[in-house]
Amino acid sequence: MRTGIGIDVHPFAEGRKLVIGGVEIPSAKGLDGHSDADVLLHAVSDALLGAAALGDIGLHFPNTSQEFKDIDSMILLKHVKKLLDKEGFRIVNIDAMLLLEAPKIASYINEMRKNIARCLGLELNAVSVKATTNEKLGYIGREEGAAAHAVCLIQVKP
């Protein structure tokens, strides 16, 4: 068994869609980044890559490459799954936490879980997504950005 942790942060920007966990959420601002800036999927991807000792998303999907400009992060997560499969790993579970002040996303969490589970070939009960605010503290509290943390457990396939 191996564990991995992933953390990602993106600032908010005008004129961008807000996509978290593969779900487009109505918002005046979206997250800024080279890809679609899906902070949740980036943290999950980093956790999985770390658990398998395969580096991080910056190594596999550099923000200097036009190939990944505005790419759907679900495509990146699918590629991460293929890398783990190739190395002989099976994903046991994922636990993730979103940190953002606004918008409120509780009504979207189950859809995020379903998207991640479907993408990774997991049962829904193997994917946990939670959200919290930063109690108005720091850049998250000032609604300047959002962050996500993810932990995963993987094992070598029998």
From Swiss-Prot:
It catalyses: 4-CDP-2-C-methyl-D-erythritol 2-phosphate = 2-C-methyl-D-erythritol 2,4-cyclic diphosphate + CMP. Disulfide bonds: none annotated. The record marks H34, T133 as: Transition state stabilizer. Binds 1 divalent metal cation per subunit. Pathway: Isoprenoid biosynthesis; isopentenyl diphosphate biosynthesis via DXP pathway; isopentenyl diphosphate from 1-deoxy-D-xylulose 5-phosphate: step 4/6. Keywords: Isoprene biosynthesis, Lyase, Metal-binding. The keyword Lyase applies. PROSITE patterns: ISPF (PS01350). The keyword Lyase applies. Its cofactor is a divalent metal cation. Signal peptide: none annotated. 4-CDP-2-C-methyl-D-erythritol 2-phosphate binds at D8, V9, H10, H34, S35, D56, I57, G58, T132, T133, N134, E135, R142. It is an enzyme of class 4 (lyase). A divalent metal cation binds at D8, H10, H42. InterPro entries: MECDP_synthase, MECDP_synthase_CS, MECDP_synthase_sf. It comes from the Bacteria. GO terms for biological process: isopentenyl diphosphate biosynthetic process, methylerythritol 4-phosphate pathway; terpenoid biosynthetic process. One of its GO terms (molecular function) is metal ion binding. Its EC number is 4.6.1.12. Homotrimer. Involved in the biosynthesis of isopentenyl diphosphate (IPP) and dimethylallyl diphosphate (DMAPP), two major building blocks of isoprenoid compounds. Catalyzes the conversion of 4-diphosphocytidyl-2-C-methyl-D-erythritol 2-phosphate (CDP-ME2P) to 2-C-methyl-D-erythritol 2,4-cyclodiphosphate (ME-CPP) with a corresponding release of cytidine 5-monophosphate (CMP). Belongs to the IspF family. This is 2-C-methyl-D-erythritol 2,4-cyclodiphosphate synthase.
